[in-house]
């Protein structure tokens, strides 16, 4: 339950107080946001519209792209608008809402990457039973589990912040409401709360990252035992997923696998995994996947010159 406090709004410092720098950042982040939304929604629509992309991996890819689009919308529009404002403020309820939604979709993204790694494991190690194991009901169940995991983690984060008192100051040294900058403003000792946040966020992030690396190692090792062609494809077969895992988890590990503290570089690392990575997602999958490229070309009205059914796989 929230304790009494005299804070009704927070002031976000953002990146810079210089107008010229703010204008340049406004243009840059606006373009990034537009590209992010167009790219991710293009993947979602292409997968829904294409009769050839019915494999479970594309179902999860569409979900990942949709979540990335929503996740980016949680942060980028506020950042873009604030760059045009002299006083960057956010109300207490809006700040709590942003914190909850950001963690909800960010954590769902993390769990969905685990689900996609499992999907690739089944497709590679049990190809004859792939469609039987990864049937429609299982895919929906795995998606629900990913969303539930993100929801529970977000509830914990919001309860931690909401239950502690804010007495001032109300200046957040960040461009949005994030957990560590908010804990710095609490009027009580947050040492043990910080340890709980590290365990809940950082440790889980590290464990999942390690499990993902192990799973990709198992997949690559399994591919090498198949045939000369399998050995040739081994370095590339799951590269799209692996690249996304590295881009997302490395900044998160640096930010959350440590005691509660804030550094100037935190803002730039947060931009990388919350603004840049969702933009890169569609390009990585389009460049690494010929089926995805063909589906987008067909959606946009281009003739790919190829017909017929193609086995669904990422390469």
From Swiss-Prot:
Cellular localisation: Cell membrane
Record carries keyword Translocase: no
Keyword Acetylation on entry: no
Coiled-coil ranges (or none): none
Glycosylation sites: 6
Membrane topology per record: Multi-pass membrane protein
Residue intervals annotated with topology Cytoplasmic: 46-57, 117-139, 215-235, 288-315
Transmembrane domains' residue ranges: 25-45, 58-80, 96-116, 140-160, 194-214, 236-256, 267-287
Cystine pairs: 95-177
Molecular-function GO terms, alphabetical: G protein-coupled receptor activity; olfactory receptor activity
GO CC aspect terms: plasma membrane
Gene3D superfamilies assigned: Rhodopsin 7-helix transmembrane proteins
Extracellular side: 1-24, 81-95, 161-193, 257-266
Keyword entries, A-Z: Cell membrane, Disulfide bond, G-protein coupled receptor, Glycoprotein, Membrane, Olfaction, Receptor, Sensory transduction, Transducer, Transmembrane, Transmembrane helix
Purpose of the protein: Odorant receptor.
Annotated family: Belongs to the G-protein coupled receptor 1 family.
Protein name (record): Olfactory receptor 4A8
Gene, per the UniProt record: OR4A8
């Amino acid at each position: 339950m929230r304790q009494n406090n005299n804070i009704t709004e927070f002031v976000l410092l953002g990146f810079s107080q210089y107008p010229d720098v703010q204008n340049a950042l406004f243009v840059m982040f606006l373009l990034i946001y537009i590209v992010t939304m167009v790219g991710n929604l293009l993947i979602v629509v292409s997968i829904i519209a294409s009769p050839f992309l019915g494999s479970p991996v594309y179902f999860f890819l569409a979900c990942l792209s949709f979540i990335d689009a929503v996740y980016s919308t949680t942060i980028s529009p506020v950042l873009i608008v604030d760059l045009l404002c002299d006083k960057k403020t956010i109300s207490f309820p809006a700040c709590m809402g942003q914190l909850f939604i950001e963690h909800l979709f960010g954590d769902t993204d993390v769990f969905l990457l685990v689900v996609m790694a499992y999907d690739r494991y089944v497709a590679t190690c049990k190809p004859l039973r792939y469609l039987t194991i990864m049937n429609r009901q299982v895919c929906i169940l795995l998606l629900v589990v990913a969303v539930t995991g993100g929801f529970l983690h977000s509830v914990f984060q919001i309860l931690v912040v909401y239950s502690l008192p804010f007495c001032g100051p109300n200046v957040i040294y960040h461009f949005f409401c994030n957990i560590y900058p908010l804990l710095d403003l609490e009027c009580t000792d947050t040492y043990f709360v910080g340890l709980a946040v590290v365990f809940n966020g950082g440790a889980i992030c590290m464990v999942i990252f390690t499990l993902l690396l192990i799973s990709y190692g198992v997949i690559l090792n399994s591919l090498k035992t198949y045939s000369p062609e399998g050995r040739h494809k081994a370095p590339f077969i799951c590269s799209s997923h692996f690249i996304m895992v590295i881009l997302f988890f490395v900044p998160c590990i640096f930010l959350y696998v440590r005691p509660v503290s804030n550094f100037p570089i935190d803002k730039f690392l947060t931009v990388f995994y919350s603004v840049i990575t969702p933009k890169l997602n569609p390009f990585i999958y389009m460049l690494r996947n010929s089926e995805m490229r063909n589906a987008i070309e067909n959606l946009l009205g281009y003739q790919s010159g190829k017909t017929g059914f193609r086995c669904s796989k990422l390469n």
